[in-house]
Amino acid sequence: MFTGSIVALITPMDDKGNVDRASLKKLIDYHVASGTAAIVSVGTTGESATLNHDEHVDVVLQTLELADGRIPVIAGTGANATSEAISLTQRFNDTGVVGCLTVTPYYNRPMQEGLYQHFKAIAESTDLPQILYNVPSRTGCDMLPPTIARLAKIKNIVAVKEATGNLSRVSQIQVLVDDEDFILLSGDDASGLDFMQLGGQGVISVTANIAAREMVELCALAAQGNFAEARRLNQRLMPLHQHLFVEANPIPVKWAAKKLGLMANDTLRLPMTPLTDPAKRVVEDALKSAGLL
């Protein structure tokens, strides 16, 4: 469940900014039908930063209810205070989530020892499997391979989502982690195939929100070692991988999901603003290049 194409699911909202349950069900049904390996609910792409704690928990619980056992659900549980991350993680004990994706603390920029103690404390507070999430472009904090290797020794820390885009990290982590079962996941669609060719086991994907079947196929081809065919598919998807970030994520992907009829609105909460007209043209061209329009 922690390998293959895992979608970093968008959180659909109605025109008033409330969670759109009907569209959420439609998105979940789409991923079940497409064979997506798992859903990450309320991660970065799910707008965790603009949901309060109760809303955050509610969206994950709604996702669990609507998934109804048909697809595994991973809860996003990161925070920049360890106590807050523990509290949020513990809200999902015994709910049915299969694990938690926990981003490094943001803004306060802890040292490597602080990162180790942060994730160790979270892991020790729960039996839920933990996926570390390293995305320094957003957090201002880079969790280095030696720290990841230390954390990998903790029983319920089972994987890392590496979103630096630095492919050398794959080999660096593999050399340091003495556990063949520890899973390496790419958090960068544009370099995801190369990441898997170096030994990664999947992608936690933004692109999968709107190209779910294609991302499932891409990850399956990589797992089979058929990188020639995987590269042909990836070349078709590359404009999406790149241009879904033409403006801040998840602005473009929510617009694209609405454009494709996957949800009713592309509403965001401030400070996120709607996709601009020039960017719409860029994303539309990418959708056409991928064969989705």
From Swiss-Prot:
Gene3D superfamilies: Aldolase class I. It is found in: Cytoplasm. Keywords: Amino-acid biosynthesis, Cytoplasm, Diaminopimelate biosynthesis, Lyase, Lysine biosynthesis, Schiff base. PROSITE patterns: DHDPS_1 (PS00665), DHDPS_2 (PS00666). Pyruvate binds at T45, I204. Its main location: cytoplasm. One of its GO terms (biological process) is diaminopimelate biosynthetic process. It comes from the Bacteria. Its EC number is 4.3.3.7. Belongs to the DapA family. Homotetramer; dimer of dimers. This is 4-hydroxy-tetrahydrodipicolinate synthase. The lineage of its organism: Bacteria, Pseudomonadati, Pseudomonadota, Gammaproteobacteria, Enterobacterales.
